[in-house]
Amino acid sequence: MSWIGIKKAINRAGTQVMLKTGHIEQTIDKEYEFQEKRYRTMEENSIKLQKNLRLYLDSLRLLTNSQINIAESLNSFYGTNNDKRSSNISRTGSVNTGDKIQTIHEEEGEEKEEEENDNTTTTTTTTTTTITTTNTTYNYNNLIQEYYATIKQLNDSCIANLENPYNQTVLNPIARFNSYYIEINEIIKKRHNKLLDYDAMKNKLRKLIENPTTNISPSMKTNIIELNHNQYEEKLKIYNQELTEVESKYVEINNQLLIELPKLINHRISYFDPSFESFVKIQLRFFNENYHVLNQLQLKLDAQTRQDYIEGKLEDRIDDVLRKMKKLDITSGLD
């Protein structure tokens, strides 16, 4: 900062103190204050919106990662063994993951093993699920393995297909809009400085008019009255010129803001409308893809489980399993 800039900053700081203490009359423009208040509200809301939109994308990543973690834990918990429940799934279906449609072909073979355990015969059914994609074929022994693979592929496809349009149509436009605040705030700051200069100059001129002798140098007080009057008139002329100059600068920037701030505020609706529409469509696409894929897996659950769920009997089935577990010797001490 140059010496002139430092001097101006010091003078403006002194003017601010005198304004706060009431020693200088402050210029008030209620129309401008109203428009600046509207502008500050818009600035606060749009910056908050940008932050929340970034957090929304992060939350979707967190959601899909949590789904993968749960699916991975379920896959480890179930292991590779089949049970009767996983063998009763529907045999055909299709999974749509975004742009790819995966066709599911299932081949089942039944292996019956008869074992005599207290004259009881046990029948075990083995199910193999084959998912064919464009280049790769995956074989799964149960629905949990298929669920884990499907969720993982959902994460890879949905988030990858979502990020680019979300950034281009939602995040980037609002970031570009918010970037203008830096320039606008600089103009508002400049207007504030010009107002301080204007108020300080008005106060200086007022003091000269009210107390002309205090603005005459001591050496001139011994001179004749005409010279004192001439000096006063000369100083008054200089102060008036300076006041006109600072007033012109202040009025110019003040009028500019009075015209352009309302326009900027009114343009926000038409500017954000396309991004809002895109945001809704991206949400719809993301959740529709997730729903479609998970619904295909849900259709593979055995019919009895679905019926029990509809009738509210699923909890009774769980209680029945718990009762059977309690009959085991290893869990007999848990009562």
From Swiss-Prot:
GO-annotated cellular components: actin cortical patch; actin cytoskeleton; mating projection tip; medial cortex; Rvs161p-Rvs167p complex
Compositionally biased residues, Acidic residues: 107-118
Coiled-coil regions, chain positions: 30-56, 222-259
Subcellular location: Cytoplasm, Cytoskeleton
Listed InterPro entries: AH/BAR_dom_sf, BAR_dom, BIN3/RVS161-like
The organism's taxonomic lineage, starting at the top: Eukaryota, Fungi, Dikarya, Ascomycota, Saccharomycotina
Consequence of gene disruption: Does not display the endocytic, hyphal growth, virulence, or cell wall defects exhibited by disruption in related RVS161 or RVS167.
Keyword Cytoplasm: yes
Domain BAR: 17-310
Alphabetized UniProt keyword annotations: Coiled coil, Cytoplasm, Cytoskeleton
Pfam families, per database record: BAR
Segments of this protein annotated with the region Disordered: 105-127
Listed name of the protein: RVS161-like protein RVS162
Function as written in the Swiss-Prot or TrEMBL entry: Component of a cytoskeletal structure that is required for membrane curvature.
GO biological process: actin cortical patch localization; endocytosis; plasma membrane tubulation
Origin species: Candida albicans (strain SC5314 / ATCC MYA-2876)
